[in-house]
């Protein structure tokens, strides 16, 4: 698949192999023991987060300040964009209103961290979900009720902290459908009763939304193209500029074309 480890992490071994090939005049290949591979390659950025949040007795947020510090390791790699994306996802599906979000890229004496599934998004979302849990605990409310109260609206309270209007918002309907189909309220009551009777073994149940941005902050990358030929027998020939590396791109593009010509 098109995962982040393929972006920059191959550069080191490629350079080492190039040096060997240059000096020996022969093809070179590097095969690392798993222990060395795991020690030297980048992982997901650990984050340290501090926040101050203001909310009313219902759990509605009125203001938040958040500092996100990413452990980048010894080199920048892709940490700039990763911390950016963490900042952009520190709202998840919630209207923050008066928000100040600061991102810090921290150089540390560790292996350089790199692109990893979510690319900073999960770290930002985990931070705001902790805020929602903390607000719910403070007020003694069901965390899901606090989350629903702070969801983005459809026509109001629908602009992100980076000034983008949230369109096609179906989070309210999705949550209602999932609450019913998963029997959330019933199961949560049962879990609370179980925990009260069980001094050691505990259970938990939570429902959290996800709003994930799919574009690049380098806006020129947000483009694609395809060439389609329609033949007299009704068949369609499709060419596109993407690279199929296991992520199922050819199938997905074919589905888009089928939808357009439906």
Where do the protein language model's features map onto the residues?
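Glycine-rich loop/linker segments at domain edges
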Residues: 46-131, 213-221
């Amino acid at each position: 698949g098109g995962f982040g480890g393929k972006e920059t992490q191959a550069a080191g071994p490629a350079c080492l192999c190039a040096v060997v090939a240059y000096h020996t005049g022969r093809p070179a290949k590097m095969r690392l023991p798993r222990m060395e591979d795991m020690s030297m390659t980048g992982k997901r950025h650990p984050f340290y987060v501090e926040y101050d949040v203001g909310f009313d007795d219902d759990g509605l947020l009125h203001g938040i300040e958040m500092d996100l510090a990413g452990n980048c390791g010894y080199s920048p790699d892709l940490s700039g964009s990763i911390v950016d994306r963490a900042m952009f996802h520190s709202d998840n599906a919630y209207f923050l209103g008066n928000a100040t979000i600061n991102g810090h890229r921290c150089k540390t004496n560790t292996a350089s961290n790199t692109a990893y599934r979510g690319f900073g998004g999960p770290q930002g979302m985990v931070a705001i979900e902790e805020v929602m849990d903390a607000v719910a605990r403070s007020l003694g409310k069901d965390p899901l009720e606090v989350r629903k109260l702070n969801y983005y609206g459809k026509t109001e309270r629908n602009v992100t902290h980076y000034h983008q209007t949230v369109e096609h918002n179906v989070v309210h309907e999705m949550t209602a459908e999932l609450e019913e189909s998963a029997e959330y309220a019933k199961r949560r009551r049962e879990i609370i009763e179980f925990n009260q009777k069980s001094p050691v073994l505990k259970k938990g149940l939570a429902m959290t939304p996800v709003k994930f941005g799919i574009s690049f902050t380098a806006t020129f990358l947000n483009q694609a193209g395809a060439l389609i030929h329609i033949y007299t027998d009704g068949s369609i020939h499709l060419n596109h500029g993407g690279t199929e590396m296991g992520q199922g791109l050819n199938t997905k593009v074919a589905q888009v074309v089928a939808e357009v010509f439906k």
